Each structure stands twice: as C-alpha cells, then as structure tokens.
Amino acid sequence: MDIGQSLGEIALFKGLPDDQLSDLASIALIKRYHRLSTIFSEGEPGSGFYVLLAGRVKIFKLSPDGKEQILHIFGPGEPFGEVPVFEGRSFPAHAETLENSTAVYFPRTEFVSLIKRNPSLALNMLAVLSRRLRTFTVLVDNLSLKEVPGRLAAHLLYLSQHNQGTENVELDISKGQLASLLGTIPETLSRILSRLSKQGYIESDGRHIRILDRTALEELAEGIRRL
C-alpha cells in the first residue's frame, strides 16, 4: 500500500504538497482490526489519532450501569480520536470497530511537530475540528431538545443529504445501533418507523428507506409537526 497516495485522497490532507504527504507517511502506522475490536477506551492516554481507510468505527460512552450511547459512527476517510492530539489528554470515549477495518495511526508527538512546520496542515485540522464541533452540537440539540420522531427524521434527512439528496437511503448500521445513536431503544424505533410509514412520510423495507414526504420530515425534525 502506498500510504502517501492514500493520504492524499483523504479530505483531511487534500491539497497538501507531495513533500508534506511524504512527511505524514513517514510517521504513519497502518493498523488492521477485526470486527468488534476495541481501538481505544475512555480514559486511555491520547497518544495519537486515527484516520479510517476501510470499515466502520463507532465512538460511544458507557453509563455506570453499562448502557451504551453512540456518539458517532465513522466511515472511510474520516479521522477520529483527534481531540487529545491537541489537548494532550486522555480519550473521552470508547472506539470499537463495527466490521473488519483498516486505519492509519499518527503518534501525537510526531504529528504535532509536523503541524508546527506546516500551516496548511494546521488549517486542515482546524476545519475538521470545526465540522466535528458542529456535528456534536447537532447531536446535543437532538438528544436534549427533540422527541424521538424528530431525531429519526433529522437522521434520515442527514443520510439523504450525504447521499447527494436522493430520496432513497440505506441504514448502514443495525436498528439497535441506530436506536442508541438516537438515544432510544429498538422497540421504540421500530414503532416510529412503522408510524412514519403509515403516515405516508416514508416507505421502509428492512434497511432501505424511501423518503416520500420530505417536507413532513423536515417539519418533524424542526419540531413544527408532531407524529
């Protein structure tokens, strides 16, 4: 695998000249994980961060009674565990693979040294952190201010937006994982999907969802409409 070429195709490193990509490749370590492997646990020292090349990874917190709250699910090309790189602190959550996965690992000390020498790399990291902050702001808003139907509607619209605005979306995680991501339980999620279908807002066939009434979903997501 040509690490430098692979890094150049990742949004985080887009636009960097070849010499900077070579510098990144020189400190990068390829790590491969089987499905359901722990990459790091909450409280472990944040000694570096990762960029996913293949597979999917969930970031989650555990309550004292063991209940899981999924914070984010990352796919190929996305960085994770990057906040401790700048803070020099421990990982604030757990990371586990959902399928066989390959990631590039960047040790904190070496990466920070590269950033100090390369302002363009620092700007790219700042853009990533800004997007991540917006994502978690939406998550907090959804969990604290919206009812479950609104959270689900917002998630379906998010999937549509990230699939070029198509009306057909696919749930790429299990309903149990989606329920955790939305802060509910699988039984409640199934009931809401059924109600959305009966109202004519969506068609549901397993993991395949077709949006029939985008306006209704938008109003649900915004709290204007109730299910």
Roles of regions detected by a PLM:
Residues 72-127, 134:
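Cyclic-nucleotide recognition modules
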Residues 148, 159-227:
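Phosphate-/nucleic-acid-contacting segments
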Residues 1-30, 34-35, 79, 84-85:
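Cyclic nucleotide-binding regulatory module and flanking cytosolic helices
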Residues 25-26, 44-46:
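Short, small/polar residue-rich loop motifs at catalytic or cofactor-binding pockets
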Residues 98-99, 116-186:
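Polybasic "coupling" helices that flank or enter modular domains
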Residues 38-44:
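Short phosphate-coordinating micro-motif centered on Lys-Gly-acidic
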Residues 36, 47-60, 75-77:
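Glycine- and acidic-residue-biased ligand/ion/polar-headgroup-sensing regions
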